[in-house]
Amino acid sequence: MKGFDVWAHSPSAVTGQWHALAEHVRSTARLARSFAVSFGAADLAWALGLVHDAGKCSAEWQSKLQRVAATGERVGIDHKRVGALLVRDRALAAAMAVSGHHGGLGRVRSLAALTPEPGDRETLRRFLAVVPEASALADGPSLLPEAWGESPMVGEMGVRMVFSALVDADHLDTAAHAHGLAAPRVAPPADMGGLVRRFEANRVALLAERGDGREVSDVDRVRAALYEDVVRRAVGEPGVYRLPAPTGSGKTMTAAGFALHHAAEHGKARVVVAVPFTTITQQNAGVYRDLLGDEVVLEHHSNAELDDRRLRLAAENWDSPFVVTTTVQLFDSLFGRRPARSRKLHRLANAVVVLDEVQALPMSLLVPILDALKVLTRHFGTTVLLASATQPSFEHLRVWDSLDIKPLVDAPVELFTRLRRVRYEWQVDPQPTLAQIAEQVARERQALVIVNTVGQARRLFRMVAEQAPAAEVVHLSTRMCPRHRETALTRIRGLLDDGEPVLVVSTQLIEAGVDVDFPVVFRALAPAESLQQAAGRANREGRLPGLGRVVVFDASDAPVPRFYRAGVSKTLGIFGPGRDPDDPALLDRYYRSLYTGLNVDEAERGAVIQASRMELDFEAVADGPERDGGGGKRDRGLAFRMIDEDPVSVIVTEYDPEARAAELVERLRTGSGPLGAVLRELRGHMVSLPRAVATAPHVRALCKPVIAGHEDLWEWQGGYDVHVGVDEEAIGEDTVW
């Protein structure tokens, strides 16, 4: 059998040419090797790429490919076993990358139990006839990098990395064939030095534009000094860095400046900025595009518009020098097992990863997250920057107790003191009522109130509107669709800029990096990190003649949500009059107390995930361990998932000034037009509801299916209030955001 007689893929619709298997596996091997150079596994990746499709040489597989080529059906015959068995003795657990390159990483026990089937010997003979260099892979020393043997967690991350390199290379070479390209499309190495020069030039111009016509404030001077001091430290060795920058100190720009300078200094391939909320992702990506250019910055999250094929490809594998994404995308990819999630993972090797608002990482997953970051920094050339005004004390957890965390600010207490722009007032004992808070807010000319749940926001909004009938009162929550929220925020910013009266009642979504500046902020009692984030919306630019006010209140008729109670309990014990939440020493004490109280070191979920990682059981990590009794059922509550809520999206057609949403929904129902493009256009009209809320009978009755069999997307047919969004009469009131 000659090389051109064995095919990997059916003819390209562009060229009409079949894809020769020998050509495909060699190209995949070369590409995977180039990806794995950055983490010292080039030879291993090459070997896996070379054998990954060996099973396609079976007569049965080739015959089926010929039959289905014209219809576009899948062959549906296993082709992974032969290649995995060929390299199993030398690649050990990494051979799972071959056995899982379509279905995903499994568990090492399944690989160990894998045995040849009748016909495999003949298939292997045919494969070696067309790819003779693969015969050398059967025997010899281990292909695994020596460092992977230092600990099970290093080996586990290595398997993930080489799996990522393989599946990305496989997809790229297959796509090149399908689109009639001469070679896979891979971006050239970034000129980080050039990006630094562009960033600095545009930063100076942007700051000059912002300051045009006004005096330089004390805040401006502190921001400038902080930036210069932090960037000077970018020459430091790769590792873990901490940026304890107060809200309003220019953290977004300073973190990016450090990351770019550090990348240029140390030959890093890219910068990945991960933030906890989509709203911040969009806002930060806009700033970075202004500084670096649209072609440099890849914005990757659920709401990103990626109409250009090049951008869609880059989003699949993060082949871009500057990526802005969410922590959900980052960590669900890092701990995922499916090829689509894992393709981008190898881009984290030899990269600078900025974790913005790092205090928002979920407590139940802290141990596996921090352990993975430690492995990345020690063995895969990654530098991690922890950026937050409320810096968690991760070094007090056992998983990081031996890690050297390099501070980028020598005197954080002095920095926070210089940038102190507010004074805290506490109304917690005696407790006020929401009506009393509404009375206080109504007496203000400009004020922001932040409460803990959607229901509380609705109630307080109506109370304030009743108390201040002549004022412009605006409500914000995620029960409003994104277009509605954008309109409201534009209105709020316009009134603030013009010095006009405006009173805003919001859930905590406004704390998520939304740049607004009020003279006074009222904040319902919450964990200390939320109080400080709220304070960042008061006197943000330091323009008031005195200090802004932050009023912390504990309303008797607005109880603290269950999931906040541990943090609130510690907050009340440590902070209060004269003991502000922006005191770094008190924050350190708060986090230590919180970690101990929640027993983060020993928390069940993190411990189970870590045990599954030790056992190289990638299914258990991503999908949860098998329940007692087997049967294939898994405990999803013990899986690695950044978002525990399983949300349902409802499309709001009523809030649509251009009357287009209804038309788009109809296109979804009839299947006219590309599904992805229609869904992207509808993002601005979607409201995300917790599944427990959406499936309640009285809510479900107001939802109409959009796509048959699709239980996560509905058309909302209930009321949509012009102020508060989805009709509160049909929705529960105890949901955050």
Language model region names:
Residues R270-T281, Q440-A465, H475:
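Conserved strand-helix element at the start of the C-terminal RecA-like helicase core
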Residues H9-A13, T278-T279, L298-R310, N452-G455, ...:
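Conserved helicase motor
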Residues M1-L207:
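Accessory nucleic-acid engagement/destabilization modules that flank
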Residues M1-H9, F518, R540-W737:
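C-terminal accessory region of SF2 helicases/translocases
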Residues A389-A442:
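Interdomain hinge/linker at the junction between the two RecA-like core domains of SF2 helicases
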Residues T254, A259-H261, G267-L291, A304, ...:
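Conserved Walker A/P-loop ATP-binding site and its immediately adjacent core
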Residues G293-F335:
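Inter-Walker segment of RecA-like/P-loop motor cores
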Residues R67-K80, H475-P482, E486-L489, E500-P561:
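Conserved RecA-like helicase motor core of SF1/SF2 enzymes
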